[in-house]
Amino acid sequence: MGQKVNPIGLRLGIVKTWDSRWYAEKGKYAEFIREDFKLRKFLKKKLHHAGISKIEIERSGRRVRLRVFAARPGIVIGKKGSEIEQLKKELEKMVDNEVLIDIQEVRKPELDAQLVAENVAMQLERRVAFRRAMKRGISSAMRFGAQGVKIMAAGRLGGAEMARREWYREGRMPLHTLRADIDYGYTEANTTYGVIGVKVFIFKGEILKSDTEAANPTA
């Protein structure tokens, strides 16, 4: 089971938490999900140079709080906060609610699975050999302290006639261990030969009970 499912989804409520945290009345749920999807899509497109890892959304009353995790927060904030103010106005028009934006810096982008996946995809689009791009991502993550890394690419690799899947792994990857802190990222590279899917798994160590309680005191 651990080999097949999204490793973050499998660990929700154990060592991982939800990216959208809100409660909706009956009839509003679908609307909020659609809104969340639109917000994430808009921010990812507008801030793609900033290296967006993930976007957490919280709602309370007429207020929407967005927590944006970025590798380059300076691009999001802009000079004297000009960019973030403009962004806030655009988002408030979209959701018709007050929007609060909190920018969090991703201190080690080499250990963030989503950013590693996007970096590998960018190299594939620039026609870097897929094996070299994958091995480069793995060695970089291991150098920064990952206990295990697995990168998988699927599609017409190297312009081959028949699509196939290749993967490389270094270190441990205990997908069945629920207390294992495994980060997962997925993206697609649009090459001249077609779309290549890139999946990245990064194992950062095991989260013990005391660590979980410290991170989530209400649990």
UniProtKB/Swiss-Prot annotation:
Swiss-Prot/TrEMBL keywords: Ribonucleoprotein, Ribosomal protein, RNA-binding, rRNA-binding
Residues in the signal sequence: none
Any coiled-coil regions, as ranges: none
SMART domains: KH (SM00322)
CDD domains recorded: KH-II_30S_S3
Example of a GO biological process term: translation
GO MF terms, alphabetically ordered: mRNA binding; rRNA binding; structural constituent of ribosome
Protein family according to the UniProt entry: Belongs to the universal ribosomal protein uS3 family.
Residue stretches making up the KH type-2 domain: 39-107
Quaternary organization: Part of the 30S ribosomal subunit. Forms a tight complex with proteins S10 and S14.
The species this protein was found in: Desulfatibacillum aliphaticivorans
Its biological purpose: Binds the lower part of the 30S subunit head. Binds mRNA in the 70S ribosome, positioning it for translation.
Name of the protein in its database record: Small ribosomal subunit protein uS3
GO cellular component, one term: cytosolic small ribosomal subunit
A Pfam family it matches: KH_2
